[in-house]
């Protein structure tokens, strides 16, 4: 009974991993895969980070993005001047 917590931990890990991947809908899973691939590209090209951040944070091209900016057009980030 001394090492009883090891198998329970492994089972919990496997269950959490399986639920974490299957809890997301199939459509979102495909988007997440694309986002992950593009995120790697974003990390590589940090020069145009603002536009990529706007695209990823907006999601639907319109709305709040870039922390305080607004997504305009396809993925153009405009930060309102206060």
From Swiss-Prot:
Acts as a neurotoxin by inhibiting an ion channel. Residues 24-48 form a propeptide. Keywords: Disulfide bond, Ion channel impairing toxin, Knottin, Neurotoxin, Secreted, Signal, Toxin. This is Turripeptide Lol6.1. Expressed by the venom duct. GO terms for molecular function: ion channel regulator activity; toxin activity. The lineage of its organism: Eukaryota, Metazoa, Spiralia, Lophotrochozoa, Mollusca. It comes from Iotyrris olangoensis (Sea snail). It comes from the Eukaryota. Residues 1-23 form the signal peptide. The cysteine framework is VI/VII (C-C-CC-C-C). The presence of a 'disulfide through disulfide knot' structurally defines this protein as a knottin. It is found in: Secreted. Its main location: secreted. Disulfide bonds join 54-66, 58-71, 65-77. GO terms for cellular component: extracellular region. The keyword Methyltransferase does not apply.
